[in-house]
Amino acid sequence: MAEKFIKHTGLVVPLDAANVDTDAIIPKQFLQKVTRTGFGAHLFNDWRFLDEKGQQPNPDFVLNFPQYQGASILLARENFGCGSSREHAPWALTDYGFKVVIAPSFADIFYGNSFNNQLLPVKLSDAEVDELFALVKANPGIHFDVDLEAQEVKVGEKTYRFTIDAFRRHCMMNGLDSIGLTLQHDDAIASYEAKQPAFMN
């Protein structure tokens, strides 16, 4: 089973860019592995580093700013995760330490892949995201409280509501990935298999 996601409080980093595609999130040259670990080192590689090997940090890229070290909530603009389909994108984000991405919209495939990997994609309106960017930029180091059960993001006294499909919400809150969902029906599967003719086993 995956880690359960019910509530999360974390440091927010603002990535003020629209249409961030999966090749920017994790460039294609780092996709050789099929395990989920190790991709965080190459997250936003072409933006985070000045050299191809990832040895020289780019001081002008927001993830390298000292005040955002340890951030676990990424604030972004519309159409986050667009481009080619690659599950490595949420792998890289979670391996780096992100638990939540907040944006006005997400590419459909990235959105689905995020839930499969316990990365919560939160959709808020353009106006709300604008407001959050202003808050983060005025208060570097600010933390957001994200409550999946209540479907709320709290920032100080202000609350922002979001909606998640009931099934996906259930899976995240119970730490259920596709394997976990299958194992929930282990008894029924075993019973069905026991009833099959011997030549089918």
Swiss-Prot record:
Transmembrane intervals: none
Pfam families from the UniProt entry: Aconitase_C (PF00694)
Pathway named in the protein's UniProt entry: Amino-acid biosynthesis; L-leucine biosynthesis; L-leucine from 3-methyl-2-oxobutanoate: step 2/4
GO cellular component: 3-isopropylmalate dehydratase complex
Keyword Transmembrane helix: no
SUPFAM superfamilies on file: LeuD/IlvD-like
EC number in record: 4.2.1.33
Protein's GO biological process: L-leucine biosynthetic process
Keyword Amino-acid biosynthesis: yes
Alphabetized GO MF terms: 3-isopropylmalate dehydratase activity
Keywords recorded for this protein, A-Z: Amino-acid biosynthesis, Branched-chain amino acid biosynthesis, Leucine biosynthesis, Lyase
Catalytic reaction(s) noted: (2R,3S)-3-isopropylmalate = (2S)-2-isopropylmalate
Assembly and binders: Heterodimer of LeuC and LeuD.
Function description: Catalyzes the isomerization between 2-isopropylmalate and 3-isopropylmalate, via the formation of 2-isopropylmaleate.
Family note: Belongs to the LeuD family. LeuD type 1 subfamily.
Protein name per UniProt: 3-isopropylmalate dehydratase small subunit
Annotated organism of origin: Escherichia fergusonii (strain ATCC 35469 / DSM 13698 / CCUG 18766 / IAM 14443 / JCM 21226 / LMG 7866 / NBRC 102419 / NCTC 12128 / CDC 0568-73)
Encoding gene, per UniProt annotation: leuD
